[in-house]
Amino acid sequence: TLRPSFGDIEVSVPRDRKGEFEPQVLKKNQTSISQDIEEKILSMYAKGMTTSDIETHIRDIYGVEVSDTTVSRITDKILPIAKEWQQRPLESVYAVVFMDAIHYHVRSEGQIVKKAVYIAIGIDLDGRKDVLGMWVGENESAKYWATVLNSLKNRGIEDIFIACTDNLTGFSTAIEAVFPKTEIQNCIIHQLRNSSKYVSYKDIKALMADLKTIYAAVDEAAALDALDSLSERWCKKYPKIAPSWRENWSNLSTYFKYPQEVRRLIYTTNAIEGFNRQLRKVTKAKSVFPTDDSLLKMLYLAMM
């Protein structure tokens, strides 16, 4: 008899007098973990659950004890698959490639170091979007961006029409060396954030309205006229804003060469920012990863 708060319930407990009952999760006399439980462990790992949470969940639901080593052994099976994916051949030409880096803490030689995960998402000539790769490397630098771009080239990419970034450290130098014909479009939203960073609250609405006349202009000539007007109005109060736009103009204005449909696609890095949010959501429970491989396998599972 079960006695919940709403009243007693009579439960009939079946008896297996002949010993014919066969459990579905753990078979009789089974000492190893079933494929089903391994898949559950991979699924939980992909959702960002910690090893201890996975152990508790498996014990509570399935009555099976698993250790840290077991969880690592099971999730390590993903590594060859992830590395094969990372080396797969790519299309020869991509219309747009979005590139970004997100940062994590990883143990290395007894110390906790900050590492960057370099990410590339491509849109091919048929409009299909695909994650081209994720690379765990040193903190953002031109040298490592060159490594990433050369990896893409070695996997078959011959040309990228437009590379969209948020003004990444060292990126312009690296892409000019590997794909010299590629045009760069820096993210307008990031430029707006930088422009508004030190603006007083009472001025922000008016300033953002003036900035919109620049990035929403019908063409580059009109945008430059709007930039001149903004400079005249705000240069004394906020002397760094207009020069910042002028300094980065060649990489901020690329989208004016294209029709509106293409402009909407490339003037921000929303396509990769959404993917980054997905990764951060899964990895937020991990403050430090024990190895580069442990980080890579979680990111790969999160992507799948």
Give the positions of each predicted feature:
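Structured, non-catalytic alpha/beta "coupling" segments that mediate domain-domain communication
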Residues: 1-13
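RNase H-like nuclease fold core
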Residues: 12-17, 24-30, 64-65, 73-165, ...
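Short, amphipathic alpha-helical "recognition" segments used to contact nucleic acids or chromatin
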Residues: 36-48
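DNA-recognition alpha helix
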Residues: 52-63, 301
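Short, basic interhelical loop/turn and adjoining N-cap
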Residues: 59-70, 237
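Conserved beta-strand -> loop -> alpha-helix junction used to position metal-binding or nucleic-acid-contacting
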Residues: 162-169, 174-212
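Acidic/histidine-rich catalytic cores and adjacent linkers
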Residues: 213-304
